[in-house]
Structure formats: structure tokens, C-alpha cells
A protein has these predicted regions:
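Short beta-strand/loop motif that positions the catalytic acidic residue
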Residues: 345-347
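Short beta-strand element of the alpha/beta-hydrolase
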Residues: 213-222
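C-terminal catalytic histidine-bearing segment of alpha/beta-hydrolase fold enzymes
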Residues: 352-355, 372-445
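A domain-start/cap signature at the N-terminus of enzymes
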Residues: 25-49, 72-214
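Gly/Ser-rich "nucleophile elbow"/oxyanion-hole loop immediately N-terminal to the catalytic nucleophile
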Residues: 267-302
Length: 445
């Protein structure tokens, strides 16, 4: 079994050397090298493209999916780019992007390794819970190297009109571009007060200006992503990277903080590890180092990370301007302080813990005088349908909003409903709903 320190070593290797004279390379379609391109989806990181670099600009007009092949994958599009990033698409560029079907069987890079006798939600021990707060889990999520072999099978043309014939050779990727993930810094925080070491990922807004003030989003992962490899929380799903995407940053520039916990941070007995205090201390340290708006601190988390978010809202009721709580629960007897906070809660009716758990929590909040807005949504909706439903829902203007995905809608077609499928698939969808993210950013302390 790979150790946590061994996996997530992506794209290692030296550039492939082409030992042909320049004239031969121009007459045949030999690339200088190939880069594997990954993208994070709601269910994790996938290999979604291969970028092939050429000596000179390639004309996009003559490119087609039939001109390239990638072993074991489906080619869906081929276009020119100025870099290995598909976002840099142009009419002519030295890079050719070979886009791959993200639903291909070999696209998903995550592989779960479970110790014998394990079970429960997202890889925890037998018994259905994540383990006790502070425990080091026995399971891992192992990520395969992002690698592929690409071949040019048809003739393409340079910007100058020269034809590059099929090379007849397969080119192995020798580098990796992880979209959005690579924009995060991997750091560690030594909490002298507690004595903890906390690894974390930090996204700093592009063109950061210390004379401005920026919101900060804290995302905390589920127990299944517990690891001592710092990037794991970025690869597991959209909870962190969605806020740092170019689209979100263009509309809502912010810092994104994604701690990587190496231990269980919250358990089913409504207890947290010392990482709760350490995470708060980290936020305080970052707020002193950067121009962070303390009136616009936001917290979100899935499963165990949601539970930690609730615990923070109870222990530090004036800290966060709003909380996005996804697929988690807590002891209803402890949640009264949440009645005076701004919450957006999302669960699935197929979740045997979070659904009844949040029903109990919101009932307590109403008893405390809070106004709770409720709705049932279809997790299969497209972006336009989610926005229409949100606009109708948000018209109530409630500070506490509770959405449940309808029974059976959160589980992808063909996927088993057994185990924690209804639980895990909640965050596969929840973080994709842009109007919810917009709502979070409208809130201020």
C-alpha cells in the first residue's frame, strides 16, 4: 500500500528527448513534449487533457479529434493554445490541446485503500462513524500519477502552411498541469500555543493588493480525505478549488484556506480535536499577515468538515459572517448559538445521518426564535434550474436556509445506493451551485 507521503507525486520525469534533425521534425508531427492536464470535479481530480508542444505555431483550423489518439481514452476535441492550459485557446499556438472525455473509465485518479475490516462513511472504521476526534485513520485515498501516451495520427498544419504528417510514434507525458490546484501554496503552521503542526493550502488572489481588503473562505474536508499529504483536500472535490477558480475569482476575489488534517477532526459524539483551536489560530495569523476583511470570514465544510464548522460556530459565534454547511450534523442540544447566525445548509434525503441530524438542528433553531427557510431541490438540475429555484427560495430573505436534495436525486445513474453514496454525493453537487456561493459572499458580520 502506498503511504500518504508516497502518493500524489504527479507527473515526475524528464522531458522526452527527440533525436531527429529540425527539418525532419517539421515534416513529421513530432512534438517536443507532452503535459498531462488535470481538473478537479465534484467527485475528485481527473485527467482531462494532454497538451502537446511543437517547435512552431500550429494552425487551429486544420485540427480535428481524428488527428490524435490517447491510449485508453476518448478524444473529444483538439485545438491550439499558447500554453499547456486549455484556457489559453487561440487560432494558432505552439501547444495542441487534446481534450479527453472526463467520464472515461480511466479519467478519475483517486483510488481508495481501506484497511481490512474497515467500513462506514467515506472510509472510516467499521461501525459507520469517522472514528474518534484526534485519531489517525487507517485508510488512504491514493492518487495515481497523471500520465498518458499521445500520438499524432493525422496530418496537421503550421501557421506558415507547412504540413506535419502523422509521426507514427506515441509520446509519453513528462509534466503535469493541475488546473486551479497549482495556484495554491502548500504551507505549514506551527501553533506554539497548542503545540500542533497544521499543513495547509492557501490561495492568494491574483494581483493581490495590500491596500485592499479581501474576504477569506475556510474549507474543511471530510474524514475520507484525512492525510498528511497537503494537496489531498484540493484533489478530493470542489470544496476548496471552486472558490479559487478563474470564474469565481473574477466575480468574487478572495483568499481560500484549505487545511490538510492528518487526524480525525470531529466525531459522532460531537467532539473535536485540538485542530479546531489551531485552525482558528491560523486564521488569526493570516489576518495579521494579509489584508483580510475580518467582517467577511466564511466557513464551509463537508461531512466531518461540516461538523467542525458547526463546532466553530458554537465556540466562536461572532467570527464568521456566514457558514455553508454540507452533509453534516451535530448534537442538537448544543446548537442554540447558531440561531443568531447566517447559515446555508445542504443535505441529501438519502443521507442517513445528516438528513435527520439537520432536521433536529433546524427544529432547535426555530425553538430559539430563528426563521428557517426550507426547500427540497433536485440534485440533477442544471445550472439554470438551480438558479431559478434559488431565486424563488431566496425571496424569503431568511438568514438560515435549509435545502435537502430529494430522495434518489443525488446518486448518479448506475451507481449503487448502498453505504454512504447518498452522503458523499451531496458535496459532489452542493459546491457547484453558484447562487449559493454568491449568497455566502453577500453576507457580512
Amino acid at each position: 500500500m502506498h503511504s500518504r507521503r508516497e502518493f500524489l507525486i504527479v507527473g515526475a520525469g524528464a522531458l522526452l528527448s527527440i533525436n531527429l534533425p529540425a527539418s525532419a521534425q517539421e515534416r513529421t508531427g513530432h512534438g517536443l513534449g507532452a503535459t498531462a492536464v488535470t481538473q478537479v470535479f465534484g467527485d475528485g481530480v481527473r485527467l482531462t487533457a494532454v497538451a502537446v508542444e511543437y517547435h512552431e505555431p500550429i494552425a487551429a483550423g486544420g485540427l480535428s479529434p481524428s488527428a490524435f489518439t490517447v491510449e485508453g481514452r476518448t478524444v473529444t476535441d483538439v485545438f491550439a493554445s499558447t500554453s499547456a492550459d486549455p484556457a489559453d485557446r487561440v487560432d494558432a499556438g505552439r501547444f495542441v490541446i487534446v481534450a479527453l472525455a472526463p467520464e472515461d473509465e480511466g479519467a478519475l485518479l483517486a483510488e481508495r485503500v481501506q484497511a481490512q475490516g474497515g467500513g462506514g462513511e467515506g472510509g472510516p472504521p467499521a461501525g459507520g462513524g469517522p472514528g474518534q476526534a484526534g485519531d489517525i485513520p487507517t485508510y488512504d485515498t491514493v492518487y495515481r500519477d497523471a500520465e498518458a501516451r499521445v500520438g499524432q495520427t493525422g496530418t496537421i498544419a503550421t501557421l506558415d502552411g507547412d504540413a506535419l504528417a502523422a509521426s507514427g510514434e506515441m509520446l509519453a507525458t513528462s509534466d503535469t498541469l493541475n488546473l486551479v490546484v497549482d495556484d495554491f501554496r502548500q504551507l505549514q503552521f506551527n501553533d506554539r500555543e497548542i503545540g500542533d503542526l497544521l499543513r495547509y493550502n492557501l490561495f492568494v488572489p491574483k494581483d493581490y493588493d495590500a491596500s485592499r481588503s479581501y474576504p477569506l473562505v475556510l474549507f474543511m474536508h471530510d474524514a475520507g480525505a484525512t492525510s498528511d499529504v497537503t494537496r489531498t483536500t484540493l484533489y478530493q472535490g470542489l470544496g476548496a478549488v471552486i472558490w479559487a477558480s478563474p470564474q469565481d475569482q473574477a466575480e468574487r476575489p478572495c483568499f481560500v484556506l484549505a487545511p490538510q488534517y492528518a487526524e480525525i477532526i470531529a466525531d459522532d459524539d460531537s467532539r473535536t480535536s485540538s485542530m479546531m483551536e489551531t485552525t482558528i489560530h491560523l486564521i488569526e495569523a493570516l489576518a495579521q499577515e494579509y489584508a483580510i476583511d475580518r467582517d467577511r470570514l466564511y466557513v464551509t465544510g463537508q461531512s466531518g468538515g461540516c461538523m467542525m464548522s458547526i463546532a466553530m460556530d458554537i465556540a466562536y459565534p461572532g467570527l464568521f459572517a456566514a457558514s455553508f454547511l454540507v452533509a453534516g450534523q451535530w448534537n442538537p442540544a448544543l446548537v442554540a448559538p447558531l440561531a443568531r447566525q447566517k447559515l446555508f445548509i445542504v443535505v441529501s434525503q438519502d443521507d442517513s445521518k445528516a438528513w435527520p441530524g439537520q432536521n433536529s438542528i433546524t427544529a432547535v433553531l426555530e425553538q430559539e426564535g430563528a426563521r428557517v427557510n426550507r426547500a427540497v431541490w433536485d440534485a440533477r438540475w442544471n445550472a439554470e434550474e438551480f438558479r431559478t429555484a434559488f431565486d424563488e427560495f431566496n425571496a424569503e430573505g431568511s438568514p438560515i436556509n435549509y435545502v435537502a436534495f430529494g430522495e434518489g436525486t443525488v446518486i448518479p445513474e448506475g451507481e449503487s445506493t448502498a453505504g454512504a453514496s447518498g452522503h458523499r454525493n451531496t458535496w459532489r453537487v452542493a459546491y457547484t451551485i453558484e447562487p449559493v456561493r454568491e449568497w455566502i459572499f453577500r453576507q457580512q458580520r
